[in-house]
């Protein structure tokens, strides 16, 4: 069986460099990724589109577009290369064509595109897909605590 895969841009967020670089000294990382005037760096979000036989598989669905305007401003969300659905269309894939969505984990920047809002109601973005995630991750996402509550959104 032949696999064909493509990187699908799903957005960009602006984040504190500490999360990306941890203990690496600023003098080292800023040569490669200078921060903006707010001391934030861009983090591009990507999904993986896989064609496997007659199956269309999406690994992670990106941040989606359901966040409030305030949340979008806080995260600095942008779509410089278009939205996930626009980028899937470039490969001839409509949302109805996706057979499987594999979530590596359920943080919003990876699973926000699992659902969308239509007429004020949440519905699956990929209506014909089977959505998959590790059992332990699903448990963590549905049993949040004060530390994890903001990272797992029920609507995703």
Q: In which residue ranges do the predicted regions lie?
A:
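Metallo-beta-lactamase
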Residues: 79-93, 97-109, 125-156
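Metal-dependent catalytic neighborhoods of phosphoester/phosphodiester hydrolases
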Residues: 111-121
């Amino acid at each position: 069986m032949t696999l064909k895969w493509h990187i699908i841009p799903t957005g960009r967020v602006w984040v504190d460099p500490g999360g990306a670089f941890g203990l690496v000294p600023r003098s080292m990382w800023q040569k490669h990724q200078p921060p903006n005037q707010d001391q934030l760096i861009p983090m591009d979000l990507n999904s993986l589109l896989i064609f496997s036989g007659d199956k269309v598989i999406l690994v992670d669905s990106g941040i989606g577009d359901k966040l409030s305007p305030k949340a979008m401003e806080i995260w600095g969300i942008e779509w410089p290369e278009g939205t996930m659905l626009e980028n899937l269309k470039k490969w001839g894939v409509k949302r109805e064509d996706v057979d499987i969505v594999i979530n590596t984990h359920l943080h919003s920047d990876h699973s926000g595109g699992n659902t969308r809002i239509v007429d004020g109601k949440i519905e699956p973005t990929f209506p014909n897909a089977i959505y998959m995630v590790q059992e332990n991750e699903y448990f963590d996402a549905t049993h949040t605590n004060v530390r994890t509550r903001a990272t797992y959104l029920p609507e995703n």
